[in-house]
A protein has these predicted regions:
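Conserved SAM/AdoMet-binding glycine-rich loop
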Residues: 75-202
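Proteins enriched for Cys/Gly/acidic motifs involved in redox and nucleic-acid/cofactor modification
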Residues: 1-91, 131, 142, 146, ...
């Protein structure tokens, strides 16, 4: 309700003042998992997506603020945290030093030993950094599940979508991660029926 909203948000905040938005969600009653958004917006212009026009370019929550919010969730009793973002693997491109997602995850796991499990939301195959790949092998707390924003398994359709990866890139990532940690399972976002997609294009996705 309007009254409930005003209880948490009583100050006008511009859309891009991401760091000033109060973190009101701190109670997932009777849950062991909580979600922590660390990134918003997107710098890319995929032909099927309106997010950049609705949420603006990518911007990231500073590591110190992520750590503070994470600690609050742990104090509240949560055992598993899912890091989320519109374009999660672009994290840090707008911050000083451009810290990569893998580096941030490594720091969070080091700073918060009480964290039992860490999970990632959907990530872009074109931006997975090498340190993140290595963490799947070295960090047991990083859960063995990865959801990729694949969209299509056909290179022509990917080009028309203005995606930055190819079919071969995705298969390489699958193979590389499985080589580091065989138990990792994968999920994917897939768009079916994209304009000009034929049965042959669709078979390449299957």
């Amino acid at each position: 309700t309007k009254t409930d909203v005003s209880h948490y948000f009583n100050d006008r905040v511009h859309l891009y003042d991401y760091n000033r938005i109060p973190y009101a969600i701190n109670n997932y009653q009777d849950r062991t998992r909580a979600f922590l958004q660390i990134q918003q917006g997107c710098d890319h212009r995929c032909t099927f997506c309106i997010i950049p026009y609705g949420r603006g370019n990518a911007y990231s929550l500073p590591v110190g603020e992520i750590s503070r919010r994470l600690e609050n969730l742990l104090v509240s009793g949560f055992k598993e945290i899912t890091l989320t973002g519109v374009d999660l693997t672009s994290y840090g491109n707008d911050l000083p030093g451009k810290p990569k997602l893998g580096n941030v995850i490594k720091r969070l796991l080091s700073l918060h030993p009480k964290l039992k499990r860490l999970r990632l939301s959907s990530i872009d195959p074109a931006e997975i950094d090498s340190e993140l790949l290595e963490l799947f092998q070295s960090e047991e707390k990083l859960l063995p599940y990865l959801h990729l924003s694949v969209q299509s398994g056909d290179n022509m359709i990917l080009k028309r979508m203005k995606r930055r990866h190819t079919r071969e890139d995705v298969l390489r990532i699958f193979k590389e991660i499985k080589g580091k940690r065989d138990e990792v399972k994968f999920g994917a976002d897939i768009i079916v029926g994209f304009p000009t997609e034929t049965d042959e294009h669709f078979k390449n996705t299957l």
